[in-house]
């Protein structure tokens, strides 16, 4: 049986590349059935512990996965794969922890909630290592389909349902554009392969008669990716989805999908399509500049913290796209990864504080932070550190991650974009510092309630994120070298 023997050899060779994903998929499947059948209904919260264990076990196996390609070039493990897989899994753990802070608002957290989180994380782990346009597409869909449901998880709230439907419809539209772009590139490459490395060589040698086909294909793939990271002008879904989703899912969307999509951006445009960079460099520069400008300007007018963080995340995507444009140079991928790590730390701390305040009927509006420095000085200090780091104030970790990204862009000749990034960072500092001023220079609202204890989860998430942001100030000059050991 030569076929069976060959299949067994291929599985033995290639399956170890997917051990982290296999752990998550098997765990989620067992949780849905037979686990959900035999676990009493009142014990559903134990699935949170199972989910965290699965995510940590998956993270433990990431470092042990062999470097190389598998499945006929559909998937590969390298520094980018491992580095961004760690970020995705960390975001998953943080989301499960934050979900425990909103049990009452979310209602009963059924096993499906955690299974969808695991399936979505598995899709992201596939995405960061996908080296073929077809595997990239299916990974994106596995990631997105689960998030559509999680956004609309609060079935009794019209706002959550509306956000989920909008996200799903626009997501389906963008997936169609992405798939059409892939088909055009497949045709322009001779109809032979969709592997990134091989397709890049074929597109670079394509005859002039195929130049329009190549340009349209690359442009459509770029549009599909820009939607996934909520870059301007494909950001329309982001504020409503962030505002309507359960806050832990909002935090998840701001961290994990962005990390996975940025890894795909690096692989497709930073290295995969560098042979036809003239076709996508100018459109990507426009998207990056528009994201930085519109994201920061729109954030100035927001009245709720979730929408402020939504528009802020659009601006941060613009900064990271600036790094993608320079990713072909030494240190490019490391600078983007470091920025994404810093962003994950800051977002996790900010959303933990928002969720904690929502537990007492506050935190929804920015005005709810009024006088927090007097009523909860430690929480206000942590929020101040996070806001200052998001603004890029030295010597916090956010400053160093922006510095390396902007320095790299300058060295690659993107002077105009770097100037735009610096100017829009000054705009961002205004609305971040406005939150700090509200906490320390405004009187708190009158309240007769005794201060509610922070709890173990809030203390750990906020404390750890704040401590790491502060600790980064001590190692600023060595951060990029450290990132190079991981990515």
Named regions from a protein language model:
Residues 1-487:
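Alpha-helical transmembrane segments of multi-pass membrane proteins predominantly involved
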């Amino acid at each position: 049986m030569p076929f069976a023997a060959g299949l067994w050899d291929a599985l033995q060779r290639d399956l170890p590349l997917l051990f982290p994903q296999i752990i998550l998929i098997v765990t989620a499947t067992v949780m849905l059935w037979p686990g959900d059948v035999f676990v009493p209904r009142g014990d559903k919260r134990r699935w949170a512990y199972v989910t965290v264990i699965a995510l940590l076990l998956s993270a433990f196996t990431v470092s042990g996965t062999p470097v190389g390609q598998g499945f006929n070039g559909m998937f590969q493990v390298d520094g980018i794969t491992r580095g961004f897989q760690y970020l995705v899994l960390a975001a998953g753990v943080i989301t499960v922890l934050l979900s425990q802070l909103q049990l009452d608002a979310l209602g009963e957290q059924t096993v499906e909630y955690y299974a969808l989180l695991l399936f979505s994380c598995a899709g992201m782990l596939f995405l960061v290592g996908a080296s073929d346009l077809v595997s990239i597409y299916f990974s994106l869909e596995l990631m997105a389909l689960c998030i559509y449901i999680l956004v609309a998880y609060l079935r009794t709230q019209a706002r959550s349902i509306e956000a989920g439907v909008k996200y799903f419809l626009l997501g389906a539209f963008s997936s169609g554009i992405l798939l059409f772009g892939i088909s055009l590139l497949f045709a322009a490459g001779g109809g032979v392969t969709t592997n990134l490395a091989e397709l890049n060589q074929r597109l670079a040698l394509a005859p002039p008669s195929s130049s329009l086909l190549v340009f349209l294909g690359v442009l459509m793939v770029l549009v599909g990716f820009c939607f996934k990271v909520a870059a301007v002008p494909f950001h329309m879904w982001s504020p409503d989805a962030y505002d309507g989703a359960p806050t832990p899912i909002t935090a998840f969307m701001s961290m994990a999908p962005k990390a996975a999509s940025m890894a795909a951006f690096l692989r497709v445009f930073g290295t995969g399509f560098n042979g036809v960079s003239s076709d996508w460099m100018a459109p990507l520069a426009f998207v990056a500049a528009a994201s930085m400008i519109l994201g920061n300007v729109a954030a100035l007018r927001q009245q709720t913290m979730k929408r402020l963080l939504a528009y802020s995340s659009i601006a941060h995507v613009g900064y990271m796209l600036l790094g993608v444009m320079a990713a072909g140079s030494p240190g490019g991928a490391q600078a983007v990864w470091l920025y994404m790590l810093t962003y994950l730390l800051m977002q996790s701390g900010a959303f933990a504080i928002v969720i904690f305040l929502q537990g007492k009927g506050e935190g929804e509006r920015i005005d709810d932070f009024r006088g927090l420095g007097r009523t909860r000085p430690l929480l206000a200090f942590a929020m101040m550190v996070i806001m200052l780091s998001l603004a890029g104030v030295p010597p916090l970790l956010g400053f160093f991650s922006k510095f390396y990204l902007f320095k790299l862009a300058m060295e690659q000749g993107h002077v105009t974009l770097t100037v735009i990034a610096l100017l829009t960072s000054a705009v961002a500092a205004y609305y971040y510092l406005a939150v700090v001023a509200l906490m320390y220079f405004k009187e708190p609202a009158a309240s007769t309630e005794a201060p509610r204890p922070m709890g173990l989860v809030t203390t750990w998430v906020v404390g750890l994120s704040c401590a790491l942001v502060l600790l980064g100030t001590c190692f600023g000059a060595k951060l990029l070298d450290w990132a190079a050991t991981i990515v």
